[in-house]
Curated annotation (Swiss-Prot):
Membrane topology: Multi-pass membrane protein
Protein name, as recorded: UPF0295 protein BCG9842_B4782
Membrane-traversing stretches: 12-32, 43-63
Keyword Disulfide bond: no
Organism field: Bacillus cereus (strain G9842)
Domain of life according to the entry: Bacteria
Keyword Membrane: yes
Family assignment from sequence similarity: Belongs to the UPF0295 family.
C-alpha cells in the first residue's frame, strides 16, 4: 500500500472548510437549548466564532498562496503551487521538490522543518 501525499495548501483549505461545517453544526446545536437562553447563545456564539476563524484561515492561505512558487508538474503537466522544500502536486499528488539535495530521496514532510539538516 502506497502513502497518499497531499498538497499543503489543499490541507489548509480542507481545514478551513471543516471549520465552516463544524461552526454551523455547533450553532445548530444551540437550537435544541431554546429553553435556556444562555446555553443557546453560547452555542451560537461558539459556532459563529468557528465560522469567523475559517474566514481568517481562508484569508491567510489566500495571502500565502500568492507568495508560493508556481511550477509545472512533471507527471501531469499542470501548473501547481509549491510550499516549502517538498510538497505534492495539487492535481495528481506527485511528490515534488526544488532542492537538488533531495532529488531521488523518499518523500518526507520532515524536510520542510528548519531543524532538519540534509
Amino acid at each position: 500500500m502506497s502513502i497518499k501525499y497531499s498538497n499543503k495548501i489543499n490541507k489548509i483549505r480542507t481545514f478551513a472548510l471543516s471549520l465552516v461545517f463544524i461552526g454551523l453544526f455547533i450553532a445548530y446545536l444551540g437550537v435544541f437549548f431554546r429553553e435556556n437562553i444562555i446555553v443557546m447563545t453560547t452555542f451560537m456564539m461558539v459556532g459563529f466564532l468557528a465560522v469567523i476563524a475559517s474566514t481568517v484561515v481562508y484569508f491567510w492561505i489566500g495571502m500565502l498562496s500568492t507568495k508560493t512558487i508556481q511550477i509545472i508538474c512533471p507527471s501531469c503537466d499542470k501548473p501547481t503551487k509549491m510550499l516549502g522544500r517538498v510538497d505534492a502536486c495539487m492535481h495528481c499528488n506527485q511528490p515534488l521538490t526544488l532542492d537538488r539535495d533531495l532529488e531521488g530521496k523518499e518523500f518526507d514532510e520532515k524536510y520542510n522543518k528548519k531543524s532538519y539538516k540534509s
